[in-house]
Amino acid sequence: MAANEDRDDAAAILNWEGTSEIKSANEYSRNLLFSVLDSLDGNKTIVWDRDRSVMHRVNLFAGASVLAAHGVVANHSIETKKSASTPHVVFFLAPTMVSLDLLCDYIDNVRNDSKILYQVFFIPEAWFVVRESLKTRAEGKYWERLESVKEIPLCWLPRDGECLSLSSPQIAARLLINGDWTHLHKCAVALNQLIDMCRGRSSSSNQRPMSIYAKGKWASDVAKMMGKIRNSAEADSMTKNLDPIEGLLKINRIVLIDRWMDPLTPMLSQLTFYGLLDEIYGIGMVNSVKVPEMEFKNEKDGDPFQEKEVYLIDEVYHRLKHSHINAVSIEASKVLAEIRDDEQFDRDKMSVAEYSVLVKKMPKIINRKKMIEVHMRLAEMIQSHVYCKQSDSIKLERDLLEYSDSDKAIPLIEDLIFDASPLNAVLRLISVHSLTCGGLKPSVLQHYRRIVNQSYGSSALNKVLKMQKMGLIREKGGGGKMQCEYAQMMFQQMKKNHDMLPEEFSEAKLDDMAYAYSGFSPLLCKMLEEGDRVKWVGWPKTVIGDKSDLIAERDGRGTCVFVIGGLTRSELAIIRENLPNVALITTSALITGDKLLNNITNI
């Protein structure tokens, strides 16, 4: 957790903590956590799950020093089986059977005083199956040892200071391959928590309204579930236990939209600075990337496996992240000019008061110089990767967006397969080929399948079949078991209707909807822009709360967007820069094409 404190210090110096909406949501989550800890009198020992995502999730809201201020005097890993001497042992666990096994093993093997109270908290939710298994295991032996079994619904995780994510990248695959609709219910529960952040929970039946607009099959289902949850006995029980934070988030409406209205964009190469960071290195839960240290330091000798972790939480990163990789130097030059201006001072003519101001400014100046150097090095590494390894693929993507033929295989895709290039890169291009032409001719699809099987093996072929089931690859006139239940995108028609390939665009202008993909405007973003322009007329609407009071509807601002199935960082940048009425962007996960495909492997 020391690293978490270092990140907190850096953020404080550079003064970038996110938008006011993100701060409000974070404050709500912190208070959920603190209310749990403060309800337990005396000192506490936290026993952390082996699944480090639980610790990472909690550390996004509170580091070691903050937890200590709420009575946490020791932190143990559940696998070390260390004994505790505090009145309470608090288990922070993921809601999985593996975590349940570790809990039972801890109870069996750790000889704590019988007076010590065991408090179990599943994060972010306590799944019914896990709870019931715990109750019945060993005829209730373990259940009886526990003082309480609850959940801490830390559902919404901050991303890049401008987005909230459920960190569930598997949702699209689970829905389309398994038909597991429980994931939509989890989205509905989380969105109801978002409403609580805005309106607060009250036992009064006269609640301020919240309008929900939905676009797509999943969105419509989630909107219905939200209403049912709100009106059910579950909602009634929630109003009896008010959350510690009420009404801080200023949102007037929630707009739900399916990722699968536009499955094409995640398959394309992102070209914004932080979009490419995510594509190439992967931005983790704690908003950091791990890069090869030798490459970062531009050294020829060293450990090729050594990695450097770079935290993306500072004000300089915030200034650069939305920029197109070809235009990132423009914004960087502005930051450098500001640093030079800050360093312009005449020591001989400065008063004591001016020296005092300078001393206070120096840490920020030094840190800004350090961070601009770090981020420009990352930009150099990204540009080198794009030009050396991705330029041909990016050009092919552009060609397919302009014109795509379903009757023949693409030579570049064939060459990449024969060269055993990274599988996901190949599959993404096949998907782009299929989606842009409205489905591949059966002979072309069979040819792709055959050569993929020859070069990568049966596991890769299985992945292709799952992509068919998800609708990422389609066969013209195809049906049967491989037919995707979700309606086809109809790219050629949508391209004309929404002007997705404008004749003129600028990579340097962030208010150009085509800048992030070098001339391509994502359909999902265009749909949101159109909806915002017409004030969501024509989008199915559900009102939660008192329907007689819709004063907030008159104000076009304060819109919250929730994308079910994932959102790319480049799309996030487009929405932030082009839709000023959108105050908060939320999603089931921030994704890349690779992350989307990786989540179908184990299904």
Curated annotation (Swiss-Prot):
Coiled coil: none
SUPFAM superfamilies with a match to the protein in the record: Sec1/munc18-like (SM) proteins (SSF56815)
Record's protein name: Vacuolar protein sorting-associated protein 33A
Single Gene Ontology BP annotation: vesicle-mediated transport
Protein encoded by which gene: vps-33.1
Membrane topology: Peripheral membrane protein
Expression by tissue: Ubiquitously expressed at high levels in somatic tissues including the pharynx, muscles, hypodermis, neurons, coelomocytes and spermatheca. Expressed in the intestine.
Cell location: Lysosome; Early endosome; Late endosome; Apical cell membrane
Alphabetized Gene3D superfamilies for the sequence: 1.25.40.850, 3.40.50.1910, 3.40.50.2060, Syntaxin Binding Protein 1, Chain A, domain 2 (3.90.830.10)
Alphabetical keyword list: Cell membrane, Endosome, Lysosome, Membrane, Protein transport, Transport
Provenance organism: Caenorhabditis elegans
InterPro entries in the cross-refs: Sec-1-like_dom1, Sec-1-like_dom3a, Sec1-like, Sec1-like_dom2, Sec1-like_sf, VPS33_dom3b
GO cellular component terms given for this protein: apical plasma membrane; CORVET complex; early endosome; HOPS complex; late endosome; lysosome
Traits of the deletion mutant: Viable, and develop into fertile adults, but their progeny arrest before embryonic morphogenesis. Defective endosome/lysosome size and fusion, and delayed endocytic trafficking to lysosomes in coelomocytes. Reduced number of gut granules in the adult intestine. RNAi-mediated knockdown results in a reduced number of gut granules in embryonic intestinal cells.
Pfam entry (one): Sec1
Chief location of this protein within or outside the cell: other
Job description of the protein: Plays a role in vesicle-mediated protein trafficking to lysosomal compartments including the endocytic membrane transport pathways. Believed to act as a component of the putative HOPS endosomal tethering complex which is proposed to be involved in the rab-5-to-rab-7 endosome conversion probably implicating sand-1, and via binding SNAREs and SNARE complexes to mediate tethering and docking events during SNARE-mediated membrane fusion.
Subunit structure comment from the entry: Probable component of the homotypic fusion and vacuole protein sorting (HOPS) complex consisting of the core class C Vps proteins vps-11, vps-16, vps-18, and which further associates with vps-33.1, vps-39 and vps-41. Interacts with spe-39.
Family: Belongs to the STXBP/unc-18/SEC1 family.
